Design a protein with these regions (language model features):
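Generic hydrophobic, amphipathic alpha-helix propensity
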Residues: 3-12, 28, 53-57, 61-64, ...
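Hydrophobic alpha-helical connector segments
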Residues: 52, 67-95, 153-157, 179
Length: 193
């Protein structure tokens, strides 16, 4: 692993645990063994480093979802919705730092004043909602999902799923303990009757 990759990996953990505001470059330097000058050689400032991480988070999450949905054969759109929910919960459980980073409030405060930060966050969430929307559209085409606004329904499905992940991220409730109920509730909401 290159020094730059090592810095990115450690900084991802640090920003996930402490947030953008409270993470310090001195602490990152200590964690990686890289001098602060080396960190600033690779990344102009703390904000640039954070934006690099957000871009990596976006690409990682969306690419993993794209790979997953490309290799899966879904019987129906309703089955795809259930699988996407399950995979989202799986990803959040296996990559907790990525999701904790997205759930930290200070990223959104930065997005208010930094258009690149806002773009990365919007692209990440739009990419995820688009996956849910594809599943809803597929279900409406095959008849497994009733007639409703695909985009609005995708937003609701994503919000339900991500809300459960947030509980898990903040150690309030184990997302896995409710995954079956979440999927069953979404099925009841969507099924074409």
């Amino acid at each position: 692993m290159s020094k730059k990759e090592s810095i990115l990996q450690a900084a991802t953990w640090l920003f996930a645990k402490k947030g953008f505001k409270d993470a310090s470059m001195a602490e990152l330097s200590k964690m990686t063994g890289a001098a602060e000058g080396t960190i600033f050689y690779h990344f102009k400032n703390k904000e640039t480093l954070f934006l690099s991480i957000l871009e990596t988070v976006k690409l990682t999450i969306i690419n993993e979802f794209d790979e997953y949905t490309a290799k899966k054969q879904f019987k129906t759109g309703l089955d795809m919705v259930e699988e996407v929910i399950s995979f989202y919960l799986y990803m959040a459980g296996h990559n907790p730092n990525l999701f904790m980073l997205l759930h930290r409030h200070d990223a959104y405060e930065l997005a208010e004043v930094n258009p690149v930060c806002r773009e990365y966050l919007e692209d990440t969430y739009n990419g995820l909602v688009n996956i849910f929307e594809r599943a809803v559209n597929l279900g409406q085409e095959d008849g497994s999902i009733g007639a409703m606004s695909a985009r609005k329904t995708a937003l609701i499905l994503f919000t339900l799923t991500d809300g459960l992940v947030r509980f898990n991220s903040y150690n309030l409730y184990n997302a896995g303990a409710l995954s079956g109920e979440l999927i069953a509730s979404c099925r009841r909401m969507l099924i074409n009757v």
